[in-house]
Curated annotation (Swiss-Prot):
Residues 1-19 have a biased composition (Polar residues). NCBIfam families: PRK12497.1-3 (NF009150), YraN family protein (TIGR00252). This is UPF0102 protein YraN. GO terms for molecular function: nucleic acid binding. CDD domains: PoNe_Nuclease. Transmembrane segments: none annotated. Belongs to the UPF0102 family. It comes from Shigella flexneri. HAMAP family: UPF0102 (MF_00048). Residues 1-21 are annotated as: Disordered. InterPro entries: Restrct_endonuc-II-like (IPR011335), tRNA_endonuc-like_dom_sf (IPR011856), UPF0102_YraN-like (IPR003509).
Length: 131
């Protein structure tokens, strides 16, 4: 677990959710700095969650944010398994349908923003609905 300093100066432990939220906020700011526009965060649809939905031009970008302290076992990007990709695709499909769209009618892609230690890696079009 990560720690953050408090007003008293002594560090406190962050929960897994707080750590994830902090990295998602960092990814959002980083992507906005690259010119993407924020649409939504923590979108839940039938058991799946999309960390961030952004827009780059006319493209809707579904973003999975990952953090790992080190590159052991492949680092953050390697943790987006085929099973996780399938869940993200299903969640995006449901979100698009809720917003009167589909993969056939909306230009979209799936990106991964991976933080490994102090490094950030942006994998554009990391996978797609044809994977």
């Amino acid at each position: 677990m990560a720690t953050v300093p408090t007003r008293s100066g002594s560090p406190r432990q962050l929960t897994t959710k707080q750590t994830g939220d902090a990295w998602e906020a960092q990814a959002r700011r980083w992507l906005e700095g690259k010119g993407l526009r924020f649409i939504a965060a923590n979108v839940n649809e039938r058991g799946g969650e999309i960390d961030l939905i952004m827009r780059e031009g006319l493209t809707t970008v579904f973003v999975e944010v990952r953090y790992r302290r080190s590159a052991l076992y492949g680092g953050a990007a390697a943790s987006v398994t085929r099973s996780k990709q399938h869940k993200l695709l299903q969640t995006a499909r449901l979100w698009l349908a809720r917003h009167n769209g589909s993969f056939d009618t909306v230009d979209c892609r799936f990106d991964v923003v991976a933080f490994t230690g102090n490094e950030v890696e942006w994998i554009k079009d990391a996978f797609n609905d044809h994977s």
